From Swiss-Prot:
One annotated Gene Ontology cellular component of this protein: cytosol
Quaternary structure annotation from Swiss-Prot or TrEMBL: Monomer.
Name under which the protein is recorded: 2,3-bisphosphoglycerate-independent phosphoglycerate mutase
Annotated gene: gpmI
Keyword Isomerase: yes
Top-level taxonomy: Bacteria, Pseudomonadati, Bacteroidota, Bacteroidia, Bacteroidales
Pathway the protein contributes to: Carbohydrate degradation; glycolysis; pyruvate from D-glyceraldehyde 3-phosphate: step 3/5
Domain of life: Bacteria
Enzyme class: isomerase
Keyword annotations of the record: Glycolysis, Isomerase, Manganese, Metal-binding
Binding site residues for Mn(2+) 1: D396, H400, H455
Family of this protein: Belongs to the BPG-independent phosphoglycerate mutase family.
Amino acid sequence: MSKKALLMILDGWGLGDHGKDDVIFNTATPYWDYLMETYPHSQLQASGENVGLPDGQMGNSEVGHLNIGAGRVVYQDLVKINLSCRDNSILKNPEIVSAFSYAKENGKNVHFMGLTSDGGVHSSLDHLFKLCDIAKEYNIENTFVHCFMDGRDTDPKSGKGFIEQLEAHCAKSAGKVASIIGRYYAMDRDKRWERVKEAYDLLVNGIGKKATDMVQAMQESYDEGVTDEFIKPIVNAGVDGTIKEGDVVIFFNYRNDRAKELTVVLTQQDMPEAGMHTIPGLQYYCMTPYDASFKGVHILFDKENVANTLGEYLAANGKKQLHIAETEKYAHVTFFFNGGRETPYDNEDRILVPSPKVATYDLKPEMSAYEVKDKLVAAINENKYDFIVVNYANGDMVGHTGIYEAIEKAVVAVDACVKDTIEAAKAQGYEAIIIADHGNADHALNEDGTPNTAHSLNPVPCVYVTENKEAKVADGRLADVAPTILHILDMVQPAEMTGCNLIK
């Protein structure tokens, strides 16, 4: 078994449908064809939940390299929360247990506040509905929902329908709509404290237009020409849903940028000049970490701890490694590959080759691939690295231009560079794994023949360049790449890596 491994990431080099849109298939790639005929290969899934994104969402380079280096699926916040609601593990979330137990034992009110829409950018109605269900399970009488209306990520008059949906859910679950206000006020992010004050006064002091029918109140606002984003404060006259000392507040937005300012005035900082004071004893829960500087707030879904990435694990075991790419993908083979860490590990060398200074890469489709290849071959021939990762950027960066002839030239350049790199690696006793992080050049045309500049949902290749004639490679996903590299290096996979070795 070889003890040296080369991981080659061909950015944007997916496995297409072999139609006209599949530039890789339709371009002469003699060396790639040789690899596919000679060595064991398989397919990796590189999009959707296989890389921790919402189902059906295209993969991207950041997420791809994060999963490749982590050796596990790294879930995005939204997906993590969705899964937790779906499999009911949210009920065992220690912060959820603490919030609702505290309210139950101390007879406190529970408040849910956040963007009440299906826009999917800042929040999810499903998460809100689940919170209402949990309140019902804990039998909490006073559960109040404070609705921030959208109209930016949704139709400007869709909010009335969302309030109807919420009220219908609350009727069979728990909770009452206590207040409504536009996101323009409640979710400012530009330090316009006079706007935030409108939301603060509504939530804390119950200042707003009194209404007995919240859906009707929304319609009246529309009739006056005021749509969702700008809805003025509305108070449910039938309940006292103001936030009081020692209450439980759950801010259910999972995106942080527009949740910070309201959190600041409720929990972090008195602003007497603006008439806003933090509320004593508030049990305040954020869906995700809103700001590392916030004190005394709870976090329902904390950031993933990506410990023991491939880079970290190799360094801890005294291995020498090289990470190399041109500028466009340098952050991907360093920062993202190492789980979001800027600083190199011990014995980790990095080579950055400048990308060409052109307006768009169709003007130079080979980019800096040949320069990367030359530096890489020289490094391979030094024979001092146990592990090397390289990214060839062309398939993705030229793929994004949508210019077919340029993508063809990019594919030709990559094929030539793969040849020189792999032949050098074989001569020095390296085994290689060749993959992509996601597709792009494999799907360059839409069905109507217009250029497609986006990534594709296609699987990506996994080629195992080895002397072992018996070897086979199983299908998998990007999270399986790091365990496979460790297998080549004859190293035991750390517990944190939940991916699988694909070499059989």
